[in-house]
Amino acid sequence: MAGSNTLSSSEHGDDPRGHSYSIHIQTRGTTLDKYPAKQHARNVARQLGLTDGLIYLMSQSTRTLEDSDQPQPFRQRRYFFYLSGVDEPDCHLTFDIKSDILTLYVPHYDLRKAIWVGPTLRPSEAMMRYDLNAAKTYDELSKNIRTWASKRMSPVIYILHEGQKPNINAHFLAFNHEDLLPAMDACREIKDEHEIDLIRRANEISASAHIEVLLGIRNMQNEAEIHGKFLDTCVSQGARNQSYEIIAASGENAAILHYTKNNEPLDDRQLVCLDAGAEWNCYASDVTRTFPRRPYWPSCESANIYSVVQRMQEECINGLKEGVRYLDLHILAHRIAIEELLSLGILKGGSTEEILQSGASLVFFPHGLGHHVGLEVHDVSPTPLMAFSLDKYKGLPLLSCRPPCTLSAPYLKAGMVVTVEPGIYFSRPALKDARRKPLSKYIDMDVVQKYIPVGGVRIEDDILVTRDGFENLTKAPKGREMLKTIR
């Protein structure tokens, strides 16, 4: 949620194709205020329960592709970014817990690199751009660590992984690679106001790109055009990176959860499932919309399934607030799916509870309801899966579901950002496998055949959990507004 000092503006206009639009731009969280790296470092130290020690992190290094002189696309290590806000390669970071000093070490000036790719980050520039106590060149790192260690009887340096020690030959140093990662995961689980603003901005750009696809979908002939339009819109608004590979799946391809070929003709396929989200300053958005190529549903079957998923999402979103067990919402989504699929004749021969216990709904809804969103699209948390040992759901096959998303923490907390992304899919491999199982008695395969061309429907929004409810950060149109956007 934006603070009272947020600057904002709104721009209104008319698309040349006759569509009115409104874009709301917020400047907070972009370039006007610094990423709160020092506060993040203090939070991690507090989570570690320490009053002394040194945290050391290294950024991603510059690398070339295998057997090539071409550089690998750079992607910053997210834990490093969380304690620095620096999206540059070949840097190092220390946080002196006792002295409360956060220091960035940047590469030494390289004339050849400056000529070929531009100058690297300098200490003076780093101090202006980032929330640091000090910025130095890398050649000072070893000396400074030795100086820090010489003032302590038992110096301990906290690192993420055993293979990420600083390049320093000092036998008297002790390294702890067990405690830092879970402490940082616990801190990253709850987003501060600055982080929420970055996720909000990523969602604004994603919404704009989804709208552009809807405006042009009628004239598109191939999945590649959808991919290209989405990417073009994001890049033109300053978001060069995607949070994940764009999924532009038409027809039966929409039943493939992580379809990324995006190269088939649209022809007369009923629906397109576009799962795509821009990244802004290393923070992700994760947005899915499923839509026809015309401003109406091309079949009763496609309209039916969209309505099912829409109800699943709306009821689960409305149940979000601090203290709610996310697992309960996941189970709620399955109950709704079963009720609706029974009414359509896709499921048969049992009560909602019987079918839930059988696992038959997993054939159509095989993944989790959602996941954390932050520096990773599937962001970290100290408890990566929901509580399997709960007597309430013991033995329920729904708890074994996996991709495209892991299940969130047992209880929601204010400041979490989670997705709610139910879906119903008609996957030929899943249905073929179901025929061989006892649960097949609950599935009317003759009715299912009419729904195969639908492929799949998924609707996904990014939701900020608050103490008394939620805020939906995703503004891309869906439902009736989505159909009205198609021209």
Swiss-Prot record:
One GO MF term attached to the UniProt entry: metalloaminopeptidase activity
Annotated region described as Disordered, given as residue ranges: 1-22
Cross-referenced SUPFAM superfamilies: Creatinase/aminopeptidase (SSF55920), Creatinase/prolidase N-terminal domain (SSF53092)
Gene3D superfamilies according to UniProt: Creatinase/methionine aminopeptidase superfamily (3.90.230.10), Creatinase/prolidase N-terminal domain (3.40.350.10)
Protein residues bound to Mn(2+) 1: 286, 421, 460
Biological process terms in GO annotation: proteolysis
Record's cofactor remark: Binds 2 manganese ions per subunit.
Keywords assigned: Aminopeptidase, Hydrolase, Manganese, Metal-binding, Metalloprotease, Protease
Binding-site residues, Mn(2+) 2: 275, 286, 460
EC annotation from Swiss-Prot or TrEMBL: 3.4.11.9
Catalytic activity: Release of any N-terminal amino acid, including proline, that is linked to proline, even from a dipeptide or tripeptide
Domain of life according to the entry: Eukaryota
Primary role: Catalyzes the removal of a penultimate prolyl residue from the N-termini of peptides.
Name recorded for this polypeptide: Probable Xaa-Pro aminopeptidase CPC735_009100
Species of the source: Coccidioides posadasii (strain C735)
Classification lineage: Eukaryota, Fungi, Dikarya, Ascomycota, Pezizomycotina
